[in-house]
């Protein structure tokens, strides 16, 4: 996600608990995509939260709450995107888990109430997202209790080639959006493909 946003002109801070780990990630992305002017900077998590006007928490779902709390002092009034899916591998299938608040995104909003949390980017196929030479070709369902957050996330989503942002209502809908990821993963396994979400019948013109 960091490389995708940098590729369309955003200056992106990549955060990690260790700045040196973030430097390894940034250096790796720049080496992989030398033909792109990727404006990436390596930071520890706190410095990344201070730098960013919009924050994307891209940790595994069971680390999302800890991450949000660790930088909570720097998230007030900022748009915070939760893209985690609470899933468990059971046999050959992934099954959705429902956190106490109903979704990972709602849990983040409860922990950092002064932030404007949005749920987004749950269904983007990772390989396509990471291939900067090709469009992603996916709809992005965005939900939030803050209209300004939905608008901000929609604006950056629309700049990613192939992505179409869709306002999917309040944060209560994050429960279903996160859980549906398990269905897509099962389809990928069953049909040996990499599926993405594309809805018909919606005209944004």
Residue ranges of predicted features:
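Short beta-strand and adjoining strand-loop segment in the mid-core
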Residues: 93-101, 131-148
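Short, glycine-/small-residue-rich phosphate/pyrophosphate-handling segment
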Residues: 99-123, 130-131, 152
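NAD(P)+-binding Rossmann beta1-loop-alpha1 motif at the extreme N-terminus of oxidoreductases
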Residues: 1-30, 159
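Conserved Rossmann-fold NAD(P)-dependent oxidoreductase catalytic core, especially the SDR/UDP-sugar
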Residues: 80-102, 119
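A short helix-to-beta-strand connector/capping loop
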Residues: 32-41, 113-116, 163
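Active-site-lining helix/loop region of Rossmann-like oxidoreductase modules
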Residues: 138-205
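Rossmann-like NAD(P)-binding element
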Residues: 33-79, 86-92
């Amino acid at each position: 996600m960091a490389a995708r946003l940098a590729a369309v002109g955003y200056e992106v801070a990549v955060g990690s608990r260790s700045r040196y780990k973030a430097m390894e990630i940034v250096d790796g992305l720049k080496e992989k995509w030398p033909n792109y002017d990727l404006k990436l900077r390596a930071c520890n998590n706190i410095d990344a939260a201070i730098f960013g006007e919009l924050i994307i928490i891209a940790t595994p779902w069971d680390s999302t709450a800890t991450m949000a709390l660790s930088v909570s002092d720097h998230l007030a009034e900022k748009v915070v995107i939760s893209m985690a899916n609470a899933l468990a591998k059971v046999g050959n299938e992934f099954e959705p888990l429902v956190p106490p608040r109903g979704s990972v995104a709602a849990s983040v909003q409860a922990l950092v109430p002064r932030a404007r949390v949005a749920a987004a980017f749950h269904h983007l196929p990772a390989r396509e997202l990471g291939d900067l030479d090709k469009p992603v070709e996916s709809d992005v369902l965005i939900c939030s209790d803050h209209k300004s957050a939905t608008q901000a996330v929609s604006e950056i989503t629309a700049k990613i080639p192939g992505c179409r942002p869709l306002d999917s209502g309040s944060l209560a809908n994050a429960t279903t959006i996160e859980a549906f990821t398990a269905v897509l993963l099962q389809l990928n396994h069953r049909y040996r493909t990499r599926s993405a979400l594309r809805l018909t019948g919606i005209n944004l013109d």
